[in-house]
Curated annotation (Swiss-Prot):
Keywords recorded for this protein, A-Z: ATP-binding, Cytoplasm, Kinase, Nucleotide-binding, Nucleus, Phosphoprotein, Serine/threonine-protein kinase, Transferase
Organism this protein belongs to: Schizosaccharomyces pombe (strain 972 / ATCC 24843)
Residue positions where Phosphoserine is found in the record: 353-354, 357, 378, 404, 413
Main location: cytoplasm
Region (Disordered): 345-373
Name the UniProt record assigns to this protein: Serine/threonine-protein kinase ksp1
Compartment(s): Cytoplasm; Nucleus
Length: 474
């Protein structure tokens, strides 16, 4: 770690830690033509790290065509123990924490803010794809946030290229984060590979649902997930999972969450986002409620024979949900903005009260290569076979308004459990004992006896901070 000082960096504090390294905040002791900013985030990756060179090569390639929605690479160097990657520092953290706390900078108009954030992510992904680079681990934790130079605009930057590749067809199954994986990426079928480009587009659809509802629609993209099995049969079951989903939002999802990879389109996704006027029907439901209240009040002055309310005979029946959760569950997301932060729990799919093995749903992997993203261990790196529990049959005769998708478990405290991420820990997951271990790193100028650090102190560098196919004619 003393090499950092020799290179002109003074460590201020740790930002993240994981199983193979740390991310620290450092400032420049002096400026150079390459390092014009004062603060940087430095990934310190313990050797050996087999994907390091590929990640750095991709970052270098992207730095030559700098894009505002891609994290900027500054430089890299190494000593006998660590690789060091110097990247721009994003002081606002990541998108996951903003969703978790329902706290976005400059969020005066939340519907427009969602559109702005998602369009920036699409533009960043389009830039990657235009250069033949495919991320394969797109999720809110890997979208860092900063402000424009004048401080008036929130800027989203795609980060963590530990699983990125240039292969148009990939055979690396089970890489990334299972809740965001495309079905063909999650599990090998008949020895066929998958398109990382199409897998990235699928992940964008899951990210959008997170952004709007703070929820994931599926626990994993496999037919043994009952909600995903229903979705494969009929994409409109999303309206059962998210009752306030607007038609505009559904049109966006039609372009990116197609079960058939060849039908996914980044250009059509962007076009549909631009056409969105509202992401949810919350306003419509509120207006309907107010109108019904007025009707009830007016009925007090009607003759008795007129004071009767009947249902319409041609009214369409309510959909029957596949997975049921408590009827009083509230879908907490960005819309509406003033709902209290509530935790939601998966039922019939996972057990939230007891920790799960991070790889309990891992697909079988024939490769012995290590796939480890900057946010944590991927399924391939666990070397544990696939074990997916068969879903328990459930009673389906309930109103769809009492149903709920498998949820991201958002704890009330930042220190809460994030076992659902399943790929290592964020800095905010550390307990007090972990913090005591790492605080000493930046306690003095030489980064605290760094030459004697053991693997106890250094962990995985989190990213800082079929059946019927989709009917496009529907």
């Amino acid at each position: 770690m003393k090499l950092l000082q020799k290179k002109g960096y003074k460590v201020e504090r740790p930002l993240n830690k994981g199983s193979y390294g740390t991310v620290v905040l450092a400032h420049r002791l002096f400026r150079t033509p390459r390092c014009k900013d004062l603060k940087y985030a430095i990934k310190c990756i313990k050797k050996p790290a087999y994907t390091f060179l590929q990640e750095v090569n991709i970052l270098r390639q992207l730095s030559r065509s700098r894009h505002r929605n891609i994290i900027h690479f500054v430089e890299s160097f190494e000593d006998n123990v660590y690789y060091y990657v110097v990247l721009e520092y994003c002081p606002l953290g990541d998108l996951y924490e903003c969703i978790l706390n329902n706290d976005f900078p400059n969020a005066k108009n939340q519907p427009e803010m969602i559109k702005n954030i998602f369009l920036q992510i699409i533009d960043g992904v389009a830039h990657l794809h235009s250069h033949g680079i495919y991320h394969r681990d797109l999720k809110p934790e890997n979208f860092l946030l900063s402000l424009s130079e004048d401080g008036s605009e929130l800027v989203v930057k795609i980060s963590d290229f530990g699983l990125a590749c240039r292969d148009k067809i990939s055979y690396d199954f089970g890489t990334g984060s299972d809740r965001y994986m495309a079905p063909e990426q999650f599990e090998e079928v008949d020895g066929a590979g998958y398109s990382p480009r199409a897998a990235d587009i699928w992940a964008l659809g899951i990210c959008l649902l997170n952004l709007i509802f703070a929820r994931n629609p599926f626990t994993y993209p496999h037919e043994k997930d009952p909600i995903f099995a229903d979705y494969m049969l009929d994409a409109m079951t999303l309206f059962d999972v998210f009752p306030t989903l607007s038609q505009d939002t559904y049109n966006v999802l039609r372009a990116c969450l197609c079960v058939s990879p060849e039908k996914r389109s980044l250009a059509k996704t962007r076009e549909a986002v631009l056409a969105v006027t509202k992401w949810t029907t919350d306003d419509e439901e509120l207006e309907s409620f107010v109108n019904e209240e007025e009707e009830f009040r007016a009925s007090d002055f009607m003759p008795a024979e007129d004071n009767v309310r009947c249902t319409q005979s041609d009214r369409e029946p309510l959909r029957t949900p596949s997975v049921l959760t408590p009827a009083n569950t509230i879908q907490r997301g960005l819309l509406p903005s003033k709902l209290p932060a509530l935790s939601d729990v998966d039922e019939n799919i996972s057990t939230s009260s007891s920790p799960r093995s991070p790889a309990s749903l891992a697909p079988v992997n024939n490769s012995e290569r290590s796939y480890d993203s900057g946010l944590g261990e991927s399924l391939n790196n666990m070397h544990i076979g696939k074990s997916i529990a068969t879903a328990v049959p459930v009673n389906t005769k309930r109103s769809p308004y009492s149903c709920s998708a498998p949820a991201i478990v958002f704890p009330n405290s930042i220190k809460g459990n994030k076992d659902h991420l399943k790929f290592g820990r964020s800095w905010c997951d550390m307990d007090e004992e972990d913090e005591e271990d790492i605080v000493s790193f930046g306690s003095n100028d030489d980064f605290g006896a760094s030459d004697e650090l053991s693997s106890k102190h250094i962990g995985l560098a989190d990213d800082w901070n079929v059946l019927s196919q989709w009917n496009d004619n529907s």
